Amino acid sequence: MRREFCWDAYSKAAGSRASSPLPRQDRDSFCHQMSFCLTELHLWSLKNTLHIADRDIGIYQYYDKKDPPATEHGNLEKKQKLAESRDYPWTLKNRRPEKLRDSLKELEELMQNSRCVLSKWKNKYVCQLLFGSGVLVSLSLSGPQLEKVVIDRSLVGKLISDTISDALLTDSFIILSFLAQNKLCFIQFTKKMESSDVNKRLEKLSALDYKIFYYEIPGPINKTTERHLAINCVHDRVVCWWPLVNDDAWPWAPISSEKDRANLLLLGYAQGRLEVLSSVRTEWDPLDVRFGTKQPYQVFTVEHSVSVDKEPMADSCIYECIRNKIQCVSVTRIPLKSKAISCCRNVTEDKLILGCEDSSLILYETHRRVTLLAQTELLPSLISCHPSGAILLVGSNQGELQIFDMALSPINIQLLAEDRLPRETLQFSKLFDASSSLVQMQWIAPQVVSQKGEGSDIYDLLFLRFERGPLGVLLFKLGVFTRGQLGLIDIIFQYIHCDEIYEAINILSSMNWDTLGHQCFISMSAIVNHLLRQKLTPEREAQLETSLGTFYAPTRPLLDSTILEYRDQISKYARRFFHHLLRYQRFEKAFLLAVDVGARDLFMDIHYLALDKGELALAEVARKRASDIDAESITSGVELLGPLDRGDMLNEAFIGLSLAPQGEDSFPDNLPPSCPTHRHILQQRILNGSSNRQIIDRRNELEKDICSGFLMTNTCNAEDGELREDGREQEIRDGGSLKMIHFGLV
């Protein structure tokens, strides 16, 4: 098998790529090969109407012995041998008591005739499906294959309505909401599961001795409304929410009270009872409401809003549950080009991704307060972030799929095949006949995933659910070199392997040194080491500056503990960059870097090399600067540090510098037509107080006079666009940011 298929998640492949927020020179498209994701599609279906081609070795379904499918090329037997050699079942067994084949047929018939209102993964092995009629289906997996299907009809005919809107499933209780009823159904289990292997064993509700209770809730009367439910991680708080109802009062209708106008309810669960604690009316129509994973009593909402100019926006709000009351404590307004139709947060909840009606994709970073914009090749009605926070998948109801990294660089994808043909999108409609739309796309993973990068859990299965079937998973072939992992470091290393340095730097720039310091250092070291091994060009020089600038000139000031932990190690890379500049006689940039570092030995290196090259004026300036540093150290009584002991000086050089004033930010009217997928980076700043900030130049007047004769400073190109956040975020302080002037970073 070819090397591309046995490498890690991203293999080398040719293709086009979206423009980067960093300036880039034209590349040789003939020899340049790019990363892509290699996948397999496993459909849990026995239907012979899917019409999967027998030559598609990347798509699998189950077959019936009694009804062999018609083959197009006569390769079905070879495909069967390939599947069985990989321990993929070709036909399902029907042994008692599971009777897997009959259970799957019953499930497919149920999906054709009933609406699935909820699908929840309890863990990596068990999925629960709840249908509007009250049927509860449990699926057990072994890898990408079905192992067991249990259909439970215990609730059928025992509920006040068969139009279930949403549901919450826990090990202790079930909560149901209804489309046309202002009531919540609370089903409490009086008996716990007696199983040594809770992950695998599937129990029916009848074995748990349940009791059913109903609770009245406020809300619109005599109206069919989608009432959604969410629960926190400790299972003691629940929110029930629905879209805003028009406030227009009818002449014969009574005036609604505040309680009846509310569309967000806070409920408490304690001692086997459910109680409505408080209610509130959101300012705008909510798109998504969920509890935070880190703070169990915080509620995150995304609401549709409009600006003063009637332009669409999205409000990212934080509500807190304080003394059984829910109240809004923070609002961040994100301008959009069109209305948002989908959203998703990453596991660490510091990034919000929005899909819009114009096929644009917006990513807002809470830490940097930066907004990224990309154009997708589909209508982003579904978004799902990988548990590692490295990639996100965007899907459409038409069955299209596209992958982006967390810096919004697109990643090509292809199914396992004989030929290497990666594409921007994966179109399921061209692979099999699906009679309904794609309605769910979810990574198979627990609710809370560790972000330390030390876990051994592998998350390589994406659950797919079409409205009337089939069900299935998309298996990502992650390979042995990454040990099945798909993290930020793994993607950056693969980008470096394919010489996609801009994409690697963009991911590094999106990472937070304060929370992911170890991963940031490994990634930055890999990028800088790769660039220092190559010939210095203006492009690579800018890449080195940007990579080191993620630590030395971050968008937000780093914590002191972070600086102290990594400054000594990173200063060695800064010194290597200095000598790399000298090696290629980049005296101007090397001198400015030496000024920032403030190390005597660096100026002496410039002095001796300038003498060898006949640059007498520069040699004299460097020698004088080294003498000044000697004099300053003697005057202050500080002993001169050795060449490798000045790691803190590069940081100290930036103390006192602050952000330049930002002008009025606006969304760019037109996207650049350079690639099929367009991309911008839009810097957002929330300014409390005066917007006029002054840049304090650290250089003294003597340096200005000396350097003006022979040094020429280069400035970076401005970023593609800027966008001021119309913010009401309360917790953000008015502070400056470390900024490097001589280093060539804006």
From Swiss-Prot:
The lineage of its organism: Eukaryota, Metazoa, Chordata, Craniata, Vertebrata. Probable effector of the planar cell polarity signaling pathway which regulates the septin cytoskeleton in both ciliogenesis and collective cell movements. Together with FUZ and WDPCP proposed to function as core component of the CPLANE (ciliogenesis and planar polarity effectors) complex involved in the recruitment of peripheral IFT-A proteins to basal bodies. Binds phosphatidylinositol 3-phosphate with highest affinity, followed by phosphatidylinositol 4-phosphate and phosphatidylinositol 5-phosphate. Component of the CPLANE (ciliogenesis and planar polarity effectors) complex, composed of INTU, FUZ and WDPCP. Interacts with CPLANE1. Gene3D superfamilies: YVTN repeat-like/Quinoprotein amine dehydrogenase. InterPro entries: Frtz, WD40/YVTN_repeat-like_dom_sf, WD40_repeat_dom_sf. PANTHER family: HOMOLOC-13, WD REPEAT-CONTAINING AND PLANAR CELL POLARITY EFFECTOR PROTEIN FRITZ HOMOLOG. Pfam families: Frtz (PF11768). This is WD repeat-containing and planar cell polarity effector protein fritz homolog. It comes from Homo sapiens (Human).
